[in-house]
Amino acid sequence: MARTKQTARKSTGGKAPRKQLASKAARKAAPATGGVKKPHRYRPGTVALREIRRYQKSTELLIRKLPFQRLVREIAQDFKTDLRFQSSAIGALQEAVEAYLVSLFEDTNLCAIHGKRVTIQPKDMQLARRLRGERS
């Protein structure tokens, strides 16, 4: 067929079909197995549940010892300067603090569930402490 000269025509207002980008075309043309394998991801919540089970099974302390010791010494200085602590006293304090926090978070979670939520919020912790009689 012979080539003919094109003449300019008035546009009818319709959109012209867009050309695909080179990268998109290359991606479609490339075989699925030849590309880079993306890393495996667990569904949201799976890892959180695994961590919950792991920490419920364990008995080790979760707060690091030295930062906790520094905090205890800093708080104790407000009451009396030059206080000394036995290491067993710091250990007993840490055990008690962690037991209290775990119990508080359990009650906080129950308050969130009571509010038909799965995410704990500050108001849940305030309610838990209020019900315990710790704070008016």
Curated annotation (Swiss-Prot):
<feature type="modified residue" description="N6,N6-dimethyllysine; alternate">
    <location>
        <position position="28"/>
    </location>
</feature>
<dbReference type="GO" id="GO:0031507">
    <property type="term" value="P:heterochromatin formation"/>
</dbReference>
<dbReference type="GO" id="GO:0046982">
    <property type="term" value="F:protein heterodimerization activity"/>
</dbReference>
<feature type="modified residue" description="N6-methyllysine; alternate">
    <location>
        <position position="5"/>
    </location>
</feature>
<feature type="modified residue" description="N6-methyllysine; alternate">
    <location>
        <position position="24"/>
    </location>
</feature>
<dbReference type="GO" id="GO:0140602">
    <property type="term" value="C:nucleolar peripheral inclusion body"/>
</dbReference>
<dbReference type="GO" id="GO:0000792">
    <property type="term" value="C:heterochromatin"/>
</dbReference>
<feature type="modified residue" description="N6-acetyllysine; alternate">
    <location>
        <position position="15"/>
    </location>
</feature>
<feature type="modified residue" description="Phosphoserine">
    <location>
        <position position="11"/>
    </location>
</feature>
<feature type="modified residue" description="N6,N6-dimethyllysine; alternate">
    <location>
        <position position="80"/>
    </location>
</feature>
<dbReference type="GO" id="GO:0006974">
    <property type="term" value="P:DNA damage response"/>
</dbReference>
<feature type="modified residue" description="N6-acetyllysine">
    <location>
        <position position="65"/>
    </location>
</feature>
<feature type="modified residue" description="N6,N6,N6-trimethyllysine; alternate">
    <location>
        <position position="37"/>
    </location>
</feature>
<feature type="modified residue" description="N6-methyllysine; alternate">
    <location>
        <position position="10"/>
    </location>
</feature>
<feature type="modified residue" description="N6,N6-dimethyllysine; alternate">
    <location>
        <position position="5"/>
    </location>
</feature>
<keyword id="KW-0544">Nucleosome core</keyword>
<feature type="modified residue" description="N6-methyllysine; alternate">
    <location>
        <position position="19"/>
    </location>
</feature>
<comment type="subunit">
    <text>The nucleosome is a histone octamer containing two molecules each of H2A, H2B, H3 and H4 assembled in one H3-H4 heterotetramer and two H2A-H2B heterodimers. The octamer wraps approximately 147 bp of DNA.</text>
</comment>
<dbReference type="GO" id="GO:0030527">
    <property type="term" value="F:structural constituent of chromatin"/>
</dbReference>
<feature type="modified residue" description="N6,N6-dimethyllysine; alternate">
    <location>
        <position position="37"/>
    </location>
</feature>
<dbReference type="GO" id="GO:0003677">
    <property type="term" value="F:DNA binding"/>
</dbReference>
<dbReference type="InterPro" id="IPR000164">
    <property type="entry name" value="Histone_H3/CENP-A"/>
</dbReference>
<feature type="modified residue" description="N6,N6,N6-trimethyllysine; alternate">
    <location>
        <position position="5"/>
    </location>
</feature>
<keyword id="KW-0539">Nucleus</keyword>
<feature type="modified residue" description="N6-acetyllysine; alternate">
    <location>
        <position position="24"/>
    </location>
</feature>
<feature type="modified residue" description="N6,N6,N6-trimethyllysine; alternate">
    <location>
        <position position="80"/>
    </location>
</feature>
<feature type="region of interest" description="Disordered">
    <location>
        <begin position="1"/>
        <end position="42"/>
    </location>
</feature>
<feature type="modified residue" description="N6-methyllysine; alternate">
    <location>
        <position position="80"/>
    </location>
</feature>
<feature type="modified residue" description="N6-acetyllysine">
    <location>
        <position position="57"/>
    </location>
</feature>
<feature type="modified residue" description="N6,N6,N6-trimethyllysine; alternate">
    <location>
        <position position="28"/>
    </location>
</feature>
<dbReference type="GO" id="GO:1990758">
    <property type="term" value="P:mitotic sister chromatid biorientation"/>
</dbReference>
<dbReference type="GO" id="GO:0140720">
    <property type="term" value="C:subtelomeric heterochromatin"/>
</dbReference>
<protein>
    <recommendedName>
        <fullName>Histone H3.1/H3.2</fullName>
    </recommendedName>
</protein>
<keyword id="KW-0158">Chromosome</keyword>
<dbReference type="InterPro" id="IPR009072">
    <property type="entry name" value="Histone-fold"/>
</dbReference>
<feature type="modified residue" description="N6-acetyllysine; alternate">
    <location>
        <position position="37"/>
    </location>
</feature>
<dbReference type="GO" id="GO:0140463">
    <property type="term" value="F:chromatin-protein adaptor activity"/>
</dbReference>
<feature type="modified residue" description="N6,N6-dimethyllysine; alternate">
    <location>
        <position position="15"/>
    </location>
</feature>
<dbReference type="GO" id="GO:0005634">
    <property type="term" value="C:nucleus"/>
</dbReference>
<comment type="function">
    <text>Core component of nucleosome. Nucleosomes wrap and compact DNA into chromatin, limiting DNA accessibility to the cellular machineries which require DNA as a template. Histones thereby play a central role in transcription regulation, DNA repair, DNA replication and chromosomal stability. DNA accessibility is regulated via a complex set of post-translational modifications of histones, also called histone code, and nucleosome remodeling.</text>
</comment>
<feature type="modified residue" description="N6-acetyllysine; alternate">
    <location>
        <position position="10"/>
    </location>
</feature>
<feature type="modified residue" description="N6-methyllysine; alternate">
    <location>
        <position position="37"/>
    </location>
</feature>
